[in-house]
């Protein structure tokens, strides 16, 4: 019995905390490269390129290229879109972003907003988060051109 309300958000957060040790062990086993990690995460979540494209607002061809070409140019919005499509926990999302050249420093207003939304990858849809970001004048997550 807990003293806090067991709503959907708290249930998800408690579950993530309970799995923290296992999750940390698992993250140490991911490959060093972004592309290989993306492939492994998609496999674990049983997501095809099409399903991930629908959930992340990143084009299927872009996902295919990111899986196959380590040096394929991308944007922070695309990577964060993938975090949403994969429904990653905060540590998993930070791990995936950490395998890119992006540094999401909180001193930049847009980056600070992106850091805030990273915490809801497992709870919110990308559509909800994009509506919030755009209402505040920030670029939405996903690919601008779905190719």
Language model features: what each stretch is:
Residues 15-47, 126-146:
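A short, Lys/Arg-rich alpha-helix, primarily the initiator
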């Amino acid at each position: 019995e807990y003293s806090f309300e067991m709503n959907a958000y708290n249930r998800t957060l408690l579950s993530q905390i309970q799995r923290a040790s296992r999750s940390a062990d698992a993250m140490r086993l991911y490959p060093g490269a972004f592309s290989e990690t993306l492939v492994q995460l998609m496999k674990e979540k049983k997501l095809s390129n099409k399903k991930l494209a629908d959930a992340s607002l990143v084009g299927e061809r872009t996902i295919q290229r990111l899986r196959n070409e380590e040096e394929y140019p991308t944007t922070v919005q695309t990577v964060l879109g993938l975090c949403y499509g994969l429904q990653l926990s905060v540590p998993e999302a930070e791990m995936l972003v950490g395998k890119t050249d992006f540094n999401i420093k909180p001193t930049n207003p847009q980056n600070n907003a992106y850091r805030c939304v990273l915490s809801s990858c497992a709870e919110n849809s990308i559509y909800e988060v994009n509506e919030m970001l755009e209402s505040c004048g920030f670029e939405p997550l996903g690919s601008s051109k779905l190719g």
